[in-house]
A protein has these predicted regions:
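Short glycine/proline-centered loop/turn elements that form peptide/ligand docking sites
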Residues: 96, 100, 122-125, 142-148
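Conserved catalytic-core motifs of GNAT/GCN5-like acyltransferases
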Residues: 116-118, 135-152
Length: 159
């Protein structure tokens, strides 16, 4: 087992259940190549800023970055998750939830009372966020030539 993976055990009817917990940490400069394998939208000039401001997280399993989360502040005051991406091979196994939980805990510890995110309505992510307690709070359509996209759904959650 890699050093960057934790084990959580629980006694249960004369045997132990063991669950592997991936390491979730702030993104570091050394993660740049792995980061861009999952995030094709962040301008490279912004990566150093995410590292410096601790506005990015990586989920590491067996020494490999399998998920990322990055955020900024909406209206300079509300944490807004801009990107959550889990490698396809690891999707549907709870890693996204663990990344969101860590981010929400950190935001609450920093004194924030709510968080936000968004997703296009044609993506399954909206259902994921609702399961985590996020509420639909509006949306917008981008119909400017060259930037068109389906309705972007804004979601919010009190923490």
């Amino acid at each position: 087992m890699a050093l960057n993976t934790l084990l959580q055990t629980k006694e249960c009817d004369n045997f132990q259940l063991v669950r592997i917990i991936p390491m979730i940490r702030y993104v570091e400069n050394q993660d740049k190549t792995a980061w861009y394998a999952l995030d094709h939208d962040l301008p490279e000039t912004s990566f150093d800023e995410k590292v410096r401001n601790r506005q990015g997280y990586v989920c590491v399993e067996d020494g490999r970055v399998i998920g990322i989360l990055r955020y900024n502040l909406f209206w300079d005051s509300i944490p807004f998750c801009n990107m959550l991406h889990i490698d396809k091979e690891y999707q549907g196994k709870g890693y996204g939830k663990q990344l969101m939980d860590r981010w929400e805990q950190d935001m609450k510890s920093s004194g924030y009372g709510m968080v936000m995110t968004s997703t296009q309505v044609n993506e399954d992510a909206q259902h994921f966020y609702r399961k985590l307690g996020y509420k639909d709070s509006g949306g917008f359509v981008v119909d400017i030539p060259g930037y068109e996209q389906p309705l972007e759904l804004i979601l919010m959650k009190a923490i």
